[in-house]
Amino acid sequence: MCRGDSPGVAGGSGEHCLGGDDGDDGRPRLACVGAIARGFAHLWLQAATLGFVGSVVLSRGPYADAMSGAFVIGSTGLGFLRAPPAFARPPTRVCAWLRLVGGGAAVALWSLGEAGAPPGVPGPATQCLALGAAYAALLVLADDVHPLFLLAPRPLFVGTLGVVVGGLTIGGSARYWWIDPRAAAALTAAVVAGLGTTAAGDSFSKACPRHRRFCVVSAVESPPPRYAPEDAERPTDHGPLLPSTHHQRSPRVCGDGAARPENIWVPVVTFAGALALAACAARGSDAAPSGPVLPLWPQVFVGGHAAAGLTELCQTLAPRDLTDPLLFAYVGFQVVNHGLMFVVPDIAVYAMLGGAVWISLTQVLGLRRRLHKDPDAGPWAAATLRGLFFSVYALGFAAGVLVRPRMAASRRSG
């Protein structure tokens, strides 16, 4: 598909796609576009699978609470797990196989029925297999987005966020489809079989080296680009060379304070606190004759995303970085919100949950801006960014579990 006509240029930039006169101007050829599109489709499918398992399979059955807790805690922890680029391929391949085997076994047990479990309701063995498949899918997904989260050009990073957010949202909303359990099992089987034992990196690697470098998706197979990241969107202009960071660990976490503890843990801790308050509200309304607990949670979750998008637009127009000022504003908002808990507790819970979604995504985007300016940040910084992003959705699934039983009861009564 590709050949090189300038072997002396660093980074293999002389390699270009065959098939036209436009191979030298950086425009992707059809084969490369197809490979990259398949890679992003794979990202979306993995995220949708993770959302589906987290919201449907694990939130039913006699051990739903324990399994949901294991899913949330495990997903949050695995999201922060470092994946060194030099050793990422073999574990990813193993996880892809585990995802297929565990997911297939879970679907088989779910369809055939487990001893002692009602029809259509997963038993403990099914839930354990599904949990293992979810963990494996998360590890593969985390490895696939690792280079895209760290040094990818801004449009590609935003596209990656959109693809993963879309997949997680589609999968997480499966509880509201109200499809027959057999249809749900068939859909899950199709997704598991479609993913197979491959990862998005397998599709990305089929693009030519020039376009792999342009998309910064070959970091799991080769050293990171040694060019200034601000020039990454101009494939024909390489910019100044930077010191190589491959096969060596940076002595610092990241530069310019990009991984300050308050930037990472305040959103996660406040989200966990919001969930605790939501759980108290759920327990307090158990005796209610009708109506779901937290009926507006999906709208609040989407509203948090919309607020993060508007904040990012304001950041684009602002002359300085707003990441830290927004964090302090959020802390002040929480102080006021705690006072509202004694006056309008329902609104305060929603405000706390929506604010947690907003500040978490805002901090992800802010941290990524800082990491993009510091290519010597190291894999721990990318893992921190990635983990915070996945934590938003792991905790979002936990909030959704509080909604589902009451909504199901409300639907049956209607």
UniProtKB/Swiss-Prot annotation:
Location of this chain's protein in the cell: Membrane
Biased composition (Basic and acidic residues): 228-237
Main location: membrane
Pfam families assigned: Herpes_UL43 (PF05072)
Protein name, UniProt field: Membrane protein UL43
Lineage: Viruses, Duplodnaviria, Heunggongvirae, Peploviricota, Herviviricetes
Membrane topology: Multi-pass membrane protein
Gene Ontology cellular component terms for the protein in this record: membrane; viral tegument
Bilayer-spanning residue ranges: 39-59, 61-81, 96-116, 121-141, 148-168, 184-204, 339-359, 383-403
Disordered: annotated span: 225-253
Family as reported in the entry's similarity comment: Belongs to the alphaherpesvirinae HHV-1 UL43 family.
Keyword Membrane: yes
Keywords of this entry: Membrane, Transmembrane, Transmembrane helix
UniProt-listed InterPro entries: Herpes_UL43
